Amino acid sequence: MRLIIFLIALACPAVAQDAPGPFASFDLASEPVLADPHDLAIGPDGRLYVADKFGSRIAVFDPETLQLIEMLAEGLLPGVHDISFGPNGKVAVAVTGASAVAVYDDLSGLSEAPTSGVSAPRTEGALLHSNGDLYAMASGTGALIRVRDTEFLGAVDGHFGAHDVAEAPDGTIWVADNNARRLVQYSTDLEQLQVLNDPKFGFIGPRYLDVTAFGHLVVADQDAHRILLIDPSVPDGALLGVLGDGSPGLGPGKFDDPEGVAVNGNRYFFSDSDNNRIVRYSVVLN
């Protein structure tokens, strides 16, 4: 028995050494001025736009200081979960409380009636793709919908409760399939290309994600209180790094139900949702 315990003790450091560590360092945090922030995006003007769920609004931050600049459409976007910027300055907003994705010609129209939109029961995610099409995640029915202007182009089912829809550098689309604890990749024509659900990721509730210039996925696993960096180009995907220790908290390397992700070069912005703030992590480049 002593020999067995000794051998296990020898093995433990090797396991810990093989575990992926943090892929970025804590840099800055905003004041807790939000109300359950969800996904966020860098706008065409370089500012940071946050879907502030319980505020039913879009919060605008300076990405350099994480100071709040202004609130847009205050109280007009019930249960808002996502915001996406597309070609020519268009904006799509997943207005979850209205079960619709609203599309505006630009940010100045957020307080007015949308230019167009699509009905999407309990929509959690919206993507204005570089091809000009709108992809909406109708979580209530589990359908990923593709629309061009007002024309319905198709849908795929099987994603009940899914959240984000994000575009990779190669134009493919990634879905954070929350209830199924997986990530699913599609072509622009909604042909399924890949599924990432290997136990090594430890997914509990992947909500929102962004994709780096290298095609790596940065995933907020809300229920695990972690952020994962994943390389999807290898079989079954490779876990490159993790932020957070799996328990809720406040401070560097800690999150409480993180949801939103936005990547900008070597900077990573996250919605630290139950702490009602935005945090920034960075990779120092020599």
Please provide the spans of the model-predicted regions.
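Conserved beta-propeller blade signature
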Residues: R47-Y49, K90-V93, D133-A136, I173-V175, ...
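Loop/turn-rich, solvent-exposed surfaces of beta-rich toroidal or solenoidal domains
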Residues: I204-I230
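Beta-rich, blade/repeat-based domains predominating
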Residues: E31-P44, G75-P87, V118-D133, G158-D170, ...
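Short loop/turn segments immediately following the C-termini of beta-strands
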Residues: K53, T96-G97, S139-G140, N178, ...
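WD40 beta-propeller blade core
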Residues: A59, A102, A143-I145, V184, ...
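Blade-level signature of beta-propeller repeat domains, shared across WD40, Kelch, NHL, RCC1
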Residues: D256-N286
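Short loop/turn segments that connect beta-strands within beta-propeller blades
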Residues: D62-L66, Y104-G109, V147-E151, S187-E191, ...
